[in-house]
Swiss-Prot record:
Any one GO molecular function term: rRNA binding
NCBIfam families assigned to the protein according to its UniProt record, in alphabetical order: PRK08572.1, uS17_arch
Protein name: Small ribosomal subunit protein uS17A
Phylogenetic classification of the source organism: Eukaryota, Fungi, Dikarya, Ascomycota, Taphrinomycotina
Native source organism of the sequence: Schizosaccharomyces pombe (strain 972 / ATCC 24843) (Fission yeast)
Family, per entry: Belongs to the universal ribosomal protein uS17 family.
């Protein structure tokens, strides 16, 4: 994935807005929160060093609205993934269902290591960019092996 391990990779100095940093205070102070709704804060968010203002665990974003699940299709963007949500649509004329899908862009925190094929749970938040309105809350790693039964 395209997430960096270096904290200071931007032009401006990256710091958490909640923590006052000076020479007298020891390093290692970190602010994090519980997003609620039964989702655990990952250990990387608690003990990590990254700074991400759009992260639901250490940033200024609150999760409200819909909670969705989908499969990761693309991880090519910086801190953003594309997930695919498949569903069945009923056709009354033929009394049958057809498979359809929607692609959804979601912000991924550096606390997660995501690869294509992983199943992620995302929560709705305020608009983070033109297309991104969701944030990754949980990741279930994709297991390799024989072809497995999916949702549909």
């Amino acid at each position: 994935m395209a997430t960096e391990l270096v904290v200071q990779s931007e032009r401006a100095f990256q710091k958490q807005p909640h923590i006052f940093q000076n020479a007298k205070k020891g390093a290692g102070r970190r602010w994090y929160k519980d997003v609620g709704l039964g989702f655990k804060t990952p250990a990387e968010a608690i003990y990590g060093e990254y700074v991400d203002k759009k992260c639901p665990f250490v940033g200024q974003v609150s999760i409200r609205g819909r909670i969705l699940t989908g499969t990761v299709v693309s991880t090519k963007m910086h801190r953003t993934i594309i997930i695919r949500r498949e569903y069945l649509h009923f056709i009354p004329k033929y009394n049958r269902y057809e498979k359809r899908h929607k692609n959804l862009a979601a912000h991924v925190s550096p606390a997660f290591r995501i690869n294509e094929g992983d199943v992620v749970t995302v929560g709705q938040c305020r608009p983070l960019s033109k297309t991104v309105r969701f944030n990754v809350l949980r990741v279930v790693k994709h297991t390799e092996g024989p072809k497995q039964f999916g949702k549909f």
